[in-house]
Amino acid sequence: MKKILAIVLTLALSLSLTSAFAGEPLTIIATENPHAEVLELVKDDLAALGYDLEITVVSDYVVENPATSAGDVMANFFQHLPYLAGYNAEVSEEEQLVPVVYTHFEPMAIYSGTKTSLDDIADGDAIAVPNDPVNENRALLLLQAAGLITLPEGTTLESTCTPADIVDNPYNLTIQELNAELIPGARADVAYAVINGNNATLVDLVPYVDGLYAETADSEAAEAYVNVIVVKPENAEAEWVKALEQVIYTQKVYDLIVDSGFAPTFEVPAAETAAE
C-alpha cells in the first residue's frame, strides 16, 4: 500500500512539474501588434494561473517558426494558417508545428504609395507585393478583386500564383516583389503597396481606415487566414496551452483586437458576457 501511495505521489509531483514546466517561464515569440500586445494584456492573468510569461518581440517573423521547432521558445504568435501550412510543407517531420489558439483575422489591403487613390492608376504604375509564396498569391488575388489584373481561372487562396501567372494586365502594372517587412518603407518608390496586417500596424496603417481596397471581414480570406498561436505537436494538449485559451478568449482581448483594426474570430464565453 505504501508503495502504491509513493507511486501516486510521484506521478502527482511529475504532473505538477510538467504543468508548470519545472518552474521555467512560458516563452513565446511574437510580432508586435496585436500579437505581443495581446500577450502583454494577459500576462497578469497567466501569472494568476501560475505561469510566468516571457515575450520576445521581433519584427522579422521568418525566424519565429524555426525558433519554435528548435525548442528555443515554447510557442509563437504571428502567423495565419496558410503560412503555417507552407512552413510545414518545407521542413522535416521533427520540425512540424500545429495551431492551438485561434484569435483574429488581419485584412491585407492596398495602400497608397505615391498615389492616394486607385482612381489615379495609370499605365505602367508599380505596385509592391510580398514575395513569400502564400502572401504573394493572396496579394495578387486582392489586386484581381480590385479589378487591376486577371489571374488564371480557378485561382484560389490555396494557389501559388506569381506575377508570371497574370493573364491580363490592362494597366501594364509593374509588380515589384519585396520582403513583406520592407514594403511599408518602400511606399515612396511605388504607386501602391499591398501590405499584410502585421506590417501595416508597425507603421500605424489600419486596413479599413487607410487601405484603398481591403479584404472584407466576411470574405473567404477572413476564414482562411485566421491568426493562430503555434506550438510543437507534443505540446498541443499541455495545460499551459489551455491556460492561454482561457485568458485570451476574453472580452478585453476581443476589444483590443477590434481597437487594433482587426477582426476577432472567437466568441467571448457567455459567462463572462453575462457578468458584465
Regions found by a protein language model. Give the residues of each.
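Ligand-binding clefts/hinges and TM-proximal coupling segments of bilobed small-molecule sensing domains
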Residues: 130-147, 152-159, 242-276
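A conserved helix-loop-strand patch within extracytoplasmic ligand-binding domains
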Residues: 96-149
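A bilobed periplasmic-binding-protein/Venus flytrap-type ligand-binding module shared by bacterial periplasmic
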Residues: 106-118, 224-238
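Ligand-binding "clamshell"
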Residues: 86-100, 113-116, 189, 194, ...
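Alpha-to-beta junction loops
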Residues: 69-79, 125, 148, 170-173, ...
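Pocket-flanking alpha-helical
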Residues: 61-93, 201-204
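Short helix-initiation/N-cap motifs at beta->coil->alpha
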Residues: 56-66, 156-185
